[in-house]
Regions:
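Switch/connector loops and helix/strand junctions flanking conserved nucleotide-binding motifs
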Residues: 64-66, 93-100, 127, 146
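Conserved nucleotide-sensing/catalytic segment adjacent to the nucleotide-binding pocket
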Residues: 24, 28-75
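P-loop (Walker A) phosphate-binding loop of NTP-binding proteins
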Residues: 9, 21
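C-terminal accessory "lid"/substrate-recognition subdomains
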Residues: 118-166
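Post-Walker A alpha-helix
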Residues: 17-18
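Hydrophobic anchor at the beta1->P-loop junction of P-loop NTPases
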Residues: 6
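Conserved phosphate-donor/acceptor-positioning beta-strand/loop module used by diverse small-molecule
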Residues: 80-104, 138-139
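Conserved glycine(s) of the Walker
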Residues: 13
Length: 166
């Protein structure tokens, strides 16, 4: 059993990674409330659980007070020697601005008072504590969806199947 935590700035490819893992047999949860991470980990690592691999996305859509607790929760889980992998996806701000303008989606932190650039910068600050704890960081700035899929398959899924640790 393994718990994979996917985090990163909006527009960096987290949903794509979750879909890839789901296609490979992972049980995936997008936008898990950070306050439920500890409970989920306890459930995943009990003897009764038959789910071999779980992947969750935790990002800036969370309540900020809950998001601030993620590093403490991750440290607690790591101290228990649980098999947890933290993958942090990112892209440079210019690429994220372009992706949001092309998709016409609203950034989760933007509103009538906070523009897109400011929201992207704020998100970097919010997610920095998770970023520094990651076991794998992937910069998707110059990656196509196809390249990201191949990278995830090669670095995570196939290495898991052969028992190679990243």
């Amino acid at each position: 059993m393994k718990l994979t935590i996917i985090s990163g700035r909006s527009g960096s490819g987290k949903s794509t990674v979750l879909h890839i893992l789901e296609d490979r047999g992972y049980y995936c949860i997008d936008n898990l409330p950070a306050s439920l991470l500890h409970s989920l980990a306890n459930r995943v690592f009990t003897d009764e659980t038959t789910i071999p691999n779980v992947a969750v996305s935790i990002d800036a859509r969370n309540i900020s007070a809950d998001l601030e607790q993620v590093p403490n929760i991750l440290n607690d889980l790591k101290e228990k020697k649980l098999p947890i992998e933290i993958i942090f996806l990112d892209a440079n701000s210019q690429t994220l601005l372009k992706r949001f303008s092309e998709s016409r989606r609203k950034h989760p932190l933007s509103d009538e008072n906070i523009g897109l650039k400011e929201a992207i910068d704020k998100e970097s600050e919010l997610l920095e504590p998770i970023s520094v704890m990651s076991s794998l960081s992937i910069d998707t700035s110059n990656m196509s969806l196809h390249h990201l899929r191949d990278s995830i398959k090669n670095r995570i899924v196939e290495n898991k199947e052969t028992g190679i640790a990243l």
